[in-house]
Amino acid sequence: MSHHQAVSQLHLFVSILDALFSDPDCLLSSFMNVTEDELDELWSWNSPLQPELRFCMHEKVSEQAALHPEKIAIDAWDGTLTYRQVEDYSTDLAQTLQLLDGSHNQIIPVLFEKSRWTSVAVLAIMKAGACFALLDPAQPEGRLRAVVQQVSARLFVSSKAQATLAARVAPAATIIPVSASKFDKVYSPCAAQQPKTTLPPVSPDQPLYIQFTSGSTGLPKGCILTHSQYTSGAIPRADAVGYRSHSRVLDFASYAFDVCIDSMLCTLAHGATLCTPSDERRMNDMSGAMRDMRVTFAGMTPSVARTLDVDILDHLDSIALGGEGVSTSDAMSWGQRTRVVNAYGPSEATVGATINDNVASKPYITMGKRKGCAIWLTDPEDSNKLVPPGAVGELLIEGPIVATDISITRRKPRKFSLKIPNSWLKGSKSFPGRHGRIYKTGDLVRFDPDGNGEPIFVGRQDQQVKLRGQRIKLAEIEFNMQKHLPADTQLAVEVIKPSGGGEQTLVAFLVEQKKNGMRHLDGNVFGSFTTKFQSALKDMTKQLAVDLPGYMVPSAYIPLWKMPLLVSCKTDRKRLREIGTSVTRQDLRRFNSVISEKKEPTTEMEIKLRSLWGKLLGGEDDFSANDNFFSMGGDSLRAMRLVAAAREAGLVLNVPDIMLNPTLSAMATKIKPLSEEATNDVPAFSLIEKDWDMNSAKAETAKLCGVDVNEVQDVYPCTPLQEGLMALSAKFQDAYVAQRIATLPSETAQRLKEAFDTAAEGSPILRTRIVNVSGRGLFQVVLKNGRLLREHGADPAEYLRRDREEAMDLGTALFRYGLVQEAGSDETHFVITMHHAVYDGWSMPLIFDRINRAFNGLQTERSVSFKHFIKHLTSLDPAEAQDYWRERLAGVNPYQFPPLPQKGYTTQADSLLEHYVSVPTTAHNKLTLATIIRGAWALVSSLYMGHPDVVFGETLTGRSAPVNGIEEIEGPMITTVPIRVRLSLDRPISDYLQAVHAQTVKQIPHEHLGLQNIRRLSKDARVACDLRTGLVLHPREDDVGEVDMEAVPANTFLPADDAEAAREALKFNTYALMLVCTLDENGFLIMASFDSKCISKDAMERVLVVMNRIVTAFLGNPESKLGDVAVLDPSEAQDAEAMRPRDVMSDSGIGTSPIDSPKLDAAMKALSPNEEKLHSILGRILGMPETEIKSSDSFFELGGDSIGAMRLVSDARAQGLTLTVAQVFQSQSLAELAASIGNEKEDKLLDILSRILGMPKSEINGSDSFFELGGDSIGAMRLVSDARAQGLNLTVAQVFQSQSLSELASSAEETDSPQTETNSNAPYAALGKEASLYSPDRIGAYLQDQSWEIVDVYPTRPLQQLAVEGTVDLPRYSLRYELIKFATPINRQKLEQACQELVARNEVLRTVFVKDESKVLGVVLSSPRVPYSEIAVPDGEDINAFSQANIQKDIEAPKPHGSS
């Protein structure tokens, strides 16, 4: 209890005693009245009342323009404007408005996407003496039209992009589109000749703007505020919130909410800069937009603030929160990083009536100090009666900020403000009374017990609610529902919180009149609907989606036998909310099923299956025989779990059956009883080839693993996935290797180590290595002793570095861990390193569950292991899969999205975007969201590439195979397949998606053939498998609740949530574009990892917007045709045209060849070494420039003769080429002649290639490249291995880089001479062949301090280069600052010594970055003394604000390459 509360209660106690002694018959209610002292205290909190401010905000903006004409006023995504431009452009537009219609006080709607021109339009209307109504184009057209009709708009100002929409919603108005071109004349030489009109003086009493909110009549309610009413609140409010002349203010709020008016006018009136991101970035990349625009002040709801990256807060001077309650934990957390402000204010009393500018100062949140007003608390049932401090009352706002008029329609305006009640006119014993306007807010609050007069929010009194930050009048929803239902229907809309937790939900309670008053025999309050009423509900739901925003459409319709009523005969809403808390989310799903006919399961299998559905989806009795598994919340992940649940129940069901028969009745017909036979055992060495005996297999694989032959426990083939992953690791050393670290108490770490070893004994995959057996291919070898522990260490950074450098290669352990304990520490760093060839996202939790159980002394028994899956793969007839893929990919379109910048380009992802796609809660679809995403992406690709035939890759779980117990197999089973989709724009969307779904099911038996095997089937297959886009879908995992991490420490190594798991998948991206979609109950998050050289970031942002639009269209109107949604806007179409191959654009009339076309292959193809030598010799012999000699020319076409042929053979021999005159005569081209030149190394490679690729040597010549012949990563590894056996030393990288067999043979080294081993740790070694180019003198010239001593130089990676540029260039987005507060004084000299020692001991902290031509290099220094500054905080300064100011100075200071 606070001191103020104690004193108040003591005074109340004394007054009650006095009253009892003086009048024992007094009523108890009399003690609830405000005492004289309390009334005096209330008046002291509300006195004096700020006088009305009699000027207009646009006058303040004009003053700023006069003071700072060239200062940037608006920094927007679509351009910048100076204060001079804002002033001149708004004046020019105001004169235009006057010329078109000179009447004062008319209301002019304003319709813009987020843009620099919105502020100009608003100021122009203010200067013209009119009243503006801001609209958001994202709102439904029906709502926009209702607003425009209310204001009887004659003029309508819009952006150029929204002019068409403006014309639709206001057909009778004159549309004035605003864009840059409109103001070209303002600074032109003929500007003086333009017609002008004198702008009228604007009175502070004139209307400034009208703000629309939910209305109880079903129409939006309009509230008009005058200039003086707004200014009287904005001026004191802006100072408290934190608007300063140096502020860079985020323009975040939707134009539908009045907060955006403050963002514009308060910013410009204070000489600050308004930062306006695009709508797309505002919704999908707010943190990135704020970084790019260097925002220092932002206003938003707490829900949005929680989505910001942590470092964003560090760069803000203030963050203003409003629109919904702020939690104490959020306030405390954010308050450590920036100044947190809490604002409250209904539209009827301007944007903010109270401001708490020190939110983090208390363990609870108040609404803050009054600004431009007084605040009173009255009895909710009697507005004339004040409540005493501490009691809950309705908040009333008094003062000049209270609006005068409300509900503006074509009829007479209605006054809504109240006069101060007579009981208040007299004031108190210390304060005189007064007259004024008052607004009843409907909010229930109480005063802060500290006695400072600040209110604390308690709740809402009326039907106005807040849901996810949106202000909703329930009556508006009820009105719109009632229009489409029978007139005698009783209904009430409420926000409930269903039992079982989770988010609040908007629902509608309904009583069908024919059943009113009936009651179920068991007393159940829930009723039912007749068939006719259900039909009416279906039609109403469709109409609500047109009339109302999505957040105002109920998510469920709950039938009641009788509507609960109060004594007053009003709806008992409290009782409805109580009923809502008894409803589960399964109940809501059941209530929502009224739109479909219910049929009870009847057969034994249907009843059993319903039980399984219930366990998996919740609510066993909810499901009818015609319910669709996917409509009820099922997806591919739950389909696999259903298979497992069925097996536990003694039933056999497989995933394809579920996908093809999604209704409960159809699915039940596919179920079979599980046979009694136990799972067949798979003996060791039983899966290898028959001509490879066990002893030979053990001996060969043991040698390749470097272990004793007795250590080999089993050998079996690799999956195609494993082969591909190992091949990519050979190309990129750290590809597909994950490294994770957990810091644990040393005792826990030691127990966990023992648990790992125990788990390895029972899990063969942890003891598995992969080897390449010459002549046989890749095999996995299971060892008896996995030896997972790599080593101990004392320096975490050093261990991690060395661990990364130790490649996970053929023959090495693919899962290992290390323990690192620093000296004197009682904690241990537990590091695990694992290769994707032994785990995937499904098996990883299984492995760590085994480890956790071992940690707790429990055994784990699994009925199947990875080799059971291998047995299944080896039992398949490969011919069936080959026929399927050969037919599936026949005639495929060779152009894929996104295109490569040039032929042979190797992609490397360097950019990442995220975009959330909301799925309407009212959308019911009988297909999975995964199918919709596949179909939508296929249409997006088709639109951009201009072709109805598209291909992209998809990575699947691979656990749809018919293997008993497949869901508990510990091992990687994911697989990637080419998804080919052919589109017809005349086809209905529902039919198209059904075809995509059917294709997905049909490919299940063939999905494990492997990309490297599919590509060898045909030329078309090879083209299709050169995948540019990879798609990964992450279904939402069920929430298992809180877990005791001390009992399951291995879970520390698992991704924290679905989003983190998705981000981990992105680390393994080898595509030009990888899309990872994380699905949840409200939609899905797209994470796009891409190579910006293939598609720019801006273009990719627009692609994701197109994807969002198409998914929404698919769900919103599945019966429309594909062509109806296959539309690109002008900017998107421009992107598509730039990407599209020229010969695909048949309507363009351009006949040039595509960049990838075979017509240009010969011209673009690099010459082989033999061709280069022939060209040089022929140029000499024939006396012609080499540039005129083409590989397609023959010797005689170039003018050669027999003598020339003899000279050619002779000169060729001098250059090491073995050639005969007969070959010269027989060759039809120089390319063919060069290919016919033989050498021993090339012949060896020819033999190997013929064997690996399975094609005759006669079909291979020296000008062919390995990949043109159908080679892939796996083949490259086999080629290197077999070449080494033939005495040729090659690397996988050389195979990838060589353009022809001849070039590859030239680069191969004979292994007769001993190989010299290079020291990879030597200085400059990381630069490879370029090391000689970078001498210390050359690098030293770039350093800021020439005295620094260079230790090493290394190249940087693309993302590292991006971070460096983000430090050197403005705006800076790669800097990080940490503010550490010490509780007690410290030795400052020792602190500096410690900082310098930290730098000296860590190589990365001693690294600076220089730029040599276009390359960014990391330069490791010996022991530089880094800058260290001590800055004293002036007396009276706030240390946080002072620190932020110094941080901002440092951000703006130059940071050139070569500096520390």
Curated annotation (Swiss-Prot):
Record Pfam families: AMP-binding (PF00501), Condensation (PF00668), PP-binding (PF00550)
User: What EC number(s) does this enzyme carry?
Assistant: 6.3.2.-
Keyword field contains Transferase: no
Q: Which SUPFAM superfamilies match?
A: Acetyl-CoA synthetase-like (SSF56801), ACP-like (SSF47336), CoA-dependent acyltransferases (SSF52777)
- Residues forming the Carrier domain are 600-675, 1168-1241, 1236-1312
Q: What is this protein called?
A: Nonribosomal peptide synthetase 6
| Gene Ontology BP term (one) | secondary metabolite biosynthetic process
CDD domains in the cross-refs:
A_NRPS_SidN3_like (cd05918), FUM14_C_NRPS-like (cd19545)
The alphabetized UniProt keywords are: Ligase, Multifunctional enzyme, Phosphopantetheine, Phosphoprotein
This entry carries the following GO cellular component terms, namely: cytoplasm
Tell me the segments the record calls region Disordered. 1303-1324
Q: Does the keyword Phosphoprotein feature in the UniProt annotation?
A: yes
Its UniProt domain note says: NRP synthetases are composed of discrete domains (adenylation (A), thiolation (T) or peptidyl carrier protein (PCP) and condensation (C) domains) which when grouped together are referred to as a single module. Each module is responsible for the recognition (via the A domain) and incorporation of a single amino acid into the growing peptide product. Thus, an NRP synthetase is generally composed of one or more modules and can terminate in a thioesterase domain (TE) that releases the newly synthesized peptide from the enzyme.
**What residue spans carry the Polar residues bias annotation?**
1313-1322
